[in-house]
Amino acid sequence: MVGLVFVGMDHGTTGVSFTILGDDAEHFKIGREDLSTGRASALDELKDRVPLNEIDLMAITYAMGDAISTIKPIERVKNRGIISIGGAGKVTGGGTAVYSEIESSGIPTLLIPGLHRNTPCLDERFRAAYSHHASPEKVSICYNAYLETGWENMIVSDISSNTVTMLIQDGRIVGAMDACVGAMGVIHGPLDLEMLRKIDDGEKTANECFSHAGAVKIAGIDTKVSRAREELLEMYRAGRDEARLALDTMMMTIAMEIWGLAGISSGIDGIVLTGSVGAMREPYDFHGKLKDMVKEIADVRCTDSHLRLHGKCQIARDIYNGKREILGIEVEV
């Protein structure tokens, strides 16, 4: 490769994704089970695409990111930047394996924090209301949306396995609604009374309920996380009414969340819908239908599913070039 090379890594629900930003951009994803069982190595996959010693800076995310509140070098981070792995959905160990590989690789690497009660840029009322607001990849998604749109005041809704919606004012993230307290995603969602009773009665754990509180609950789907979205869409293609209702209901909860954040904002320049479902047009026009529900607030745009992965690389690039704050989050160097 010629010129500077930046890498972004996202520890997500269905796998670990990498973006390499050099003269061109390249994306690849490794499934969680492949990593946790040792069938795949993140560094082997990475060095097949770029010599590791040519990487100028890498920015990564891990789990909830709730034990750090600044972007900092990985060697300064304790316990992978988390308070606990609990409450984060299904745990397979794949993300932990990748983190350990990167930590010992010698590649210059920054860890991006999540948004939580100790994040200084958040409005104090959000910090008082919720212990956790968004996992770290949402910061990079917002940064990409910020660079792509130029909007200083916007709402970004990332819709996929879960839904998390962020509020940005004057170029700073001031609020967010996490997956367990706000809108539904395909898999995850908020816990309702029935689920709380099942937890109290010992029928299910809170994490089991959280991981079945999204659209899958309505559609009656109980399958692997990596298969849930496709199974839901297969049911929709087959004309199954429970699949249509699941998608319609999920969309309603997201529209409620967006309207709620708009209502407490000081003004919105635009709304960005992203994620595998937020950008979906076929077979169910989720993006178009949701856009119609919120377009009275402001202009609505969609971020390409690959382009949104650039956010971590863009953070690495801009910090390498001297930036010391990302959307209100301090950078330690």
Curated annotation (Swiss-Prot):
InterPro entries assigned: ATPase_NBD, Methan_mark_12
NCBIfam families, alphabetized: methan_mark_12
HAMAP family registered for this protein in UniProt: UPF0285
Family as reported in the entry's similarity comment: Belongs to the UPF0285 family.
Protein name in the entry: UPF0285 protein MTH_1441
Organism: Methanothermobacter thermautotrophicus (strain ATCC 29096 / DSM 1053 / JCM 10044 / NBRC 100330 / Delta H)
